[in-house]
């Protein structure tokens, strides 16, 4: 599972667009199969003029007669702010698959279960067991790498295909033939973050990082790039033992130790712990414009801090910045399904593409069984150098003509490689404005070296 740690970079675009995120936890009692409305509801999408449906699975459906999408996504816990866009991506994909005629004659539906977070693994353990019994065609999730590592064996041992839209831990590269992801490994984001920091002229870097697979893995690859570019890590380096446990709430000692190392930039690698860390950094006089965040905490802090506190701080987020048409479709579906306005798009495109690729794999293989999805997943992503197509309907038409395809969806990822990772992916570079809201400033594309 060890991968080469270098990456090749191409600057693609620059501009400004507000990334609006919410830290509010999202829990829904009717997101799963039980107790949910099994009758689709619909609304008209202003952007696409299509009828959107909320296609939850009815009781008793399995992959034998339905393209059944299971989900283990954060409805609760310290990554719950990622739940709405990921669920919207799954739901929109299922809706559009059904609008295009389903999967090889079968209807599509989804069953959503809670992943919780790494502070209580019993939640994801129970959800994985529930979905094994439900016999889905594919399971989308989890958001957290640590959470996926907790239950991935439960799914793969049952020959159920798992696709994460947000896992970045390098430990998951090539983990199992039944595990895929549409998010890039930390080799890519770490290279982007380390390059950003040193390009900004900073050479002495401190990491305030939690002891989590995601945090330590991304720290390691960011540190490697910083050091390769002539910088040094003065606090929180790999092997120094400065990590704090997930769920910690006070950070006076960690911030004091980091500042005593006299860094000229600080990277915060945490989830919900980031808010008290920011407060402590500010209380001890740190210049917050020299602070860097990542996908786990690159959030809208407009309701958390005084205006201007984070202005100039920067961060990275895996994924392309989707076009407005796709965002409008996500917003419309979420309003249809949840009656709420979607404000966060993080990993929405990756979740959507994860489902579309799975459905296309089922079409190519002629079955909605999960083993068929696994056998054809990489091929429909372009691993067999097929003809490019950008919608489910267009890709199905090519498959029905006997052609190989390369689905190119809104996430912008390259074909799935032999490690079941994207062969290339985008990383967004963001900067905080005076309202403490991150705005996209540029996008880079990276690919792990072979």
Annotate each predicted stretch with a short phrase:
Residues 33-34, 55, 81-88, 100-173, ...:
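Beta-alpha junction/loop-to-helix N-cap segments that form part of ligand/metal-binding clefts
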Residues 51-91, 113-121, 144-146, 210-215, ...:
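Extracytoplasmic "Venus flytrap"
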Residues 281-355, 362-368, 445-448:
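Extracellular/periplasmic periplasmic-binding protein-like sensory domains
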Residues 118-129, 134, 169-284, 321-325:
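Extracellular/periplasmic Venus flytrap/periplasmic-binding protein
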Residues 26-41:
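Bacterial lipoprotein signal-peptidase II cleavage site
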Residues 2-13:
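Bacterial N-terminal signal peptides that target proteins for export
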Residues 340-344, 362-437:
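Segments of small-molecule ligand-sensing domains
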Residues 21-25:
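C-terminal motif of bacterial Sec signal peptides marking the signal peptidase cleavage site
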């Amino acid at each position: 599972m060890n991968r080469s740690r270098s990456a090749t970079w191409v600057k693609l675009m620059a501009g400004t667009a507000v990334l609006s995120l919410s830290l509010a936890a999202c829990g829904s009692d009717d997101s799963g199969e039980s107790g949910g409305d099994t009758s689709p509801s619909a609304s008209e999408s202003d952007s696409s003029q299509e009828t959107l449906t909320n296609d939850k699975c009815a009781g008793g459906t399995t992959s034998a007669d339905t393209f059944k999408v299971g989900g283990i996504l954060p409805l609760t816990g310290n990554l719950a702010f990622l739940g709405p866009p990921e669920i919207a991506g799954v739901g929109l994909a299922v809706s559009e698959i059904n609008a295009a005629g389903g999967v090889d004659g079968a209807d599509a539906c989804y069953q959503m279960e809670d992943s919780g977070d790494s502070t209580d693994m019993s939640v994801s353990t129970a959800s994985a067991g529930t979905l094994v019994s439900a016999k889905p065609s594919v399971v989308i999730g989890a958001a957290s790498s640590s959470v996926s590592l907790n239950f991935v064996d439960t799914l793969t041992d049952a020959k159920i295909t798992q696709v994460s839209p947000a896992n970045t831990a390098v430990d998951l590269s090539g983990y199992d033939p039944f595990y895929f992801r549409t998010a890039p490994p930390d080799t890519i984001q770490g290279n982007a973050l380390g390059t950003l920091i040193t390009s900004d002229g900073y050479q002495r870097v401190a990491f305030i990082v939690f002891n989590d697979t995601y945090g330590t893995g991304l720290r390691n690859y960011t540190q490697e790039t910083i050091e390769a570019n002539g910088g040094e890590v003065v606090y929180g380096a790999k092997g120094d033992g400065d990590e704090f446990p997930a769920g910690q709430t006070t950070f006076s000692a960690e911030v004091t130790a980091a500042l005593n190392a006299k860094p000229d930039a600080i990277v915060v690698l945490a989830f919900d712990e980031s808010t008290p860390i920011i407060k402590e950094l500010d209380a001890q006089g740190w210049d917050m414009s020299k602070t860097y965040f990542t996908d786990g905490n690159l959030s809208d802090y407009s309701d958390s801090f005084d205006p201007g506190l984070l202005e100039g701080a920067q961060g990275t987020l895996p994924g392309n910045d989707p076009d407005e048409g796709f965002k409008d479709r996500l917003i419309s579906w979420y309003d249809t399904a949840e009656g709420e306005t979607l404000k966060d798009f993080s990993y929405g495109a990756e979740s959507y593409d994860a489902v579309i690729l799975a459905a296309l794999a089922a079409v190519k293989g002629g079955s909605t069984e999960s083993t068929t999805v696994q056998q054809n997943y990489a091929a429909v992503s372009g691993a067999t150098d097929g003809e490019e197509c950008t919608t489910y309907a267009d890709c199905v038409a090519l498959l029905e003509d006997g052609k190989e395809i390369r689905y190119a969806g809104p996430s912008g990822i390259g074909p799935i490689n032999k490690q079941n990772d994207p062969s290339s992916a985008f990383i967004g570079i963001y900067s905080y404005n005076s309202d403490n809201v991150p705005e996209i400033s540029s996008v880079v594309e990276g690919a792990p070296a072979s």
